[in-house]
């Protein structure tokens, strides 16, 4: 669950990639409404409520999900082939007691990783002894040396930016949450010496070592993942928090995102787990600037695309142009021959309910090539652990909007492939001049328009 440096420097109080605020009466479901919303309710009323429904499984690769949340009741995936608590791999998939998903951030003892380093700190730790004690000229043509130099410079720059704020800790200038964030950055996220993997006991560079972790689909900090799950699947019409976008969906919780940067291996295996266990949509509300094993993640993305699984990814919260600044994982590049993978991987920017220039969320990444569509990601009121609700914002919230739309459309048009669903979503956006040049469609996802397009194709 990456927390964004830029957001912190710009405003200490809004330093997180998802931001707390209070829900306002009458705005709980603005994202499903008209205006800058997705016209979800119109689609239900005029088209979708009249059609039979088939349940769709959506994998949420995230920090974990509170599978007992009151507003997710009936919408959590259950592995019917697995017998709970018998400590056996009943279905033979290699994962023991994976009842509601899998946790790649734990061990067989039931212990779990919470905090982790940023990837750039891991790179510094791994290569420092090699490159710092050698002749720089000797490594001039070594691509890992270049990666190490970039990672080291970035870590040092971040520490320098944080230094003035660290001096203010304990002086009553910050609230408890902000102080904890600052301490986490220095003690864990930006600390090359912090070991975030020994508890798990695997080799994070050995992608053939697959069967680690445990069946705890919630983990120690499921706030982010639970909110994401609620946007997709919260019970509709019960006046408990915001309504989920989809009404006939099961959430498969795959825990692979700590408080820090996710490991490439965990992401790649999480994608493959989702595909192999029946998910048709995968939501990925995370990202990072360095990815030393990105080709392995690309292989997993290609595998998902080959199985007709649609991947939805948050564009990121650095207010940056991702055509120029990498945000991993990403779709295959334009000049690479993996066209199917590129088409089946959507990057999502975040819009607000405001008009004009304020329509684009000030934190949202953008890109005329790499970002596909925008979706509501500001002031989103939905589920958090312990059957509670909070208002959060970020492209982390925009991505599950689109994942929910994809699941909803697939549930009503089961004959459609996920490629059909993807094309319907991207070709029917509601265009806004404010989004021209910020994404390749120039618009916000519109459920009603997409449903009409599919209705014509699959009568």
Q: How would you label these PLM feature ranges?
A:
Residues 17-23:
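Boundary at the C-terminal end of the N-terminal hydrophobic targeting segment
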Residues 44-57, 65-263, 340-344, 366-370, ...:
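Subtilisin-like serine protease catalytic core
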Residues 275-277, 281-284, 295, 341-347, ...:
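C-terminal subdomain of the subtilisin-like protease fold in secreted/lumenal serine endopeptidases
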Residues 23-28, 117, 135-153, 159, ...:
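Short acidic, glycine-rich surface-loop motifs adjacent to enzyme active sites
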Residues 1-5:
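Positively charged n-region of N-terminal signal peptides that target proteins for export
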Residues 7-17:
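Bacterial N-terminal signal peptides
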Residues 62, 316, 394:
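Active-site glycine-centered loops adjacent to acidic/histidine catalytic or metal-binding residues
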Residues 309, 331-411, 415, 419:
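Extracellular S/T/G-rich loop segment that most often corresponds to the catalytic His/Ser-adjacent loop
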């Amino acid at each position: 669950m990456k927390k964004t440096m830029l957001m912190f420097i710009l405003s200490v109080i809004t330093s997180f990639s998802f931001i707390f605020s209070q829900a306002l009466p009458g705005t709980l479901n603005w994202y499903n409404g008209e205006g800058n919303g997705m016209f979800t309710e119109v689609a239900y009323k005029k088209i979708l409520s009249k059609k039979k429904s088939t349940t769709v499984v959506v994998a949420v690769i995230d920090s974990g999900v509170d599978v007992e949340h009151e507003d997710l009741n009936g919408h959590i995936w259950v592995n019917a082939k697995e017998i709970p608590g018998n400590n056996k791999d009943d279905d033979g998939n290699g994962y023991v007691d994976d009842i509601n998903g899998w946790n790649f951030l734990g061990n067989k003892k039931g212990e779990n990783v919470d905090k982790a380093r940023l990837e750039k700190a891991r790179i510094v730790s791994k290569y420092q002894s090699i490159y710092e004690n050698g002749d720089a000229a000797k490594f001039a043509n070594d691509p890992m040396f270049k990666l190490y130099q970039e990672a080291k410079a970035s870590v040092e720059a971040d520490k320098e930016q944080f230094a003035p704020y660290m001096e203010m800790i304990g002086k009553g200038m910050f609230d408890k949450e902000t102080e904890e964030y600052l301490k986490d950055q220095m003690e864990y996220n930006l600390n090359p010496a912090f070991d975030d993997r020994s508890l798990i006991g695997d080799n994070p560079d050995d992608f053939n070592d697959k069967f680690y972790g445990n069946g705890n689909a919630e983990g120690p900090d499921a706030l982010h993942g639970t909110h994401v799950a609620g946007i997709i699947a919260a019970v509709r019409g019960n006046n408990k928090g915001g309504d989920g976008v989809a009404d006939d969906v099961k959430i498969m919780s795959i825990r692979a995102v700590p408080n820090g940067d996710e490991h490439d291996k965990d992401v790649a295996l999480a994608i493959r787990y989702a595909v192999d266990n029946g998910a048709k949509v995968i939501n990925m509300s995370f990202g990072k600037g360095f990815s030393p094993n990105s080709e392995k993640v690309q292989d997993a993305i290609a595998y998902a695309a080959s199985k007709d699984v649609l991947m939805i990814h948050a564009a990121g919260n650095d207010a940056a142009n991702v055509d120029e600044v990498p945000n991993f994982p990403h779709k295959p590049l334009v000049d690479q021959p993996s066209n199917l993978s590129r088409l089946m991987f959507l990057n999502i920017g975040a819009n607000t309910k405001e008009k004009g220039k304020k329509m684009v969320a000030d934190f949202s990444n953008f890109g005329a090539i790499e970002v596909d569509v925008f979706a509501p990601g500001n002031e989103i009121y939905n589920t958090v652990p312990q059957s509670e609700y909070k208002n959060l914002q970020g492209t982390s919230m925009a991505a599950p909007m689109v994942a929910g739309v994809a699941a909803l459309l697939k549930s009503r048009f089961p004959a459609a492939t996920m490629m059909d669903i993807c094309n319907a979503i991207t070709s029917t956006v509601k265009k806004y001049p404010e989004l021209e040049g910020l994404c390749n469609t120039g618009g916000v996802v519109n459920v009603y328009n997409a449903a009409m397009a599919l209705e014509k194709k699959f009568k």
